[in-house]
Amino acid sequence: MQLHKIIFRYIICLTFGAAIITGLKLITSSIALWTKRSGQVMSGIYNFSDYAKYPLSIYNKATPIKYMLLFIIPFGLIMTLPTQYIIFGFCDIFPNVYILIVTICAMSLLFNFIGVKLFNLGLYCYESSGN
């Protein structure tokens, strides 16, 4: 495969991966509108990203952690799989790279939509924590 196509697809994955991270931050930060504190939730979610530093193939197919890293808190989807694609030229979970790209794009739209809706709902419940 031509190198410029691989790099272009990788840049698309990185761009929409950044959008997923933005949506995830918006979701976890919006919790503070109700609770006044969201630091523990945010750090818990981002500590979960340590599991995505390793290839997803080390996790058994039956483990829920693999699917959580792909679809619930998709750090594996945006960290491991695009890198695996650029290094090896294929991805073991998604047989076609276009399915991977469409999944990343759809997840970024979903997470940002949920984040914006949660933020707007939180604005109705917001009370200042000032003195």
Regions flagged by a language model, labelled:
Residues 80-102:
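Extracellular/periplasmic helix-loop-helix junctions in multi-pass membrane proteins
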Residues 105-131:
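Junction motif at the cytosolic side of a transmembrane helix
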Residues 51-58, 92, 109, 129:
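Short amphipathic alpha-helical patches
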Residues 1-3, 30-38, 89-92, 119-124, ...:
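Transmembrane helix-loop junctions in multipass membrane proteins, especially transporters and channels
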Residues 8, 16, 48, 71, ...:
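Phenylalanine-focused residue identity feature
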Residues 21, 25-85:
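Transmembrane helix segments
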Residues 1-30, 34-35, 94-105, 110-112:
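Alpha-helical transmembrane segments and their short interhelical loops
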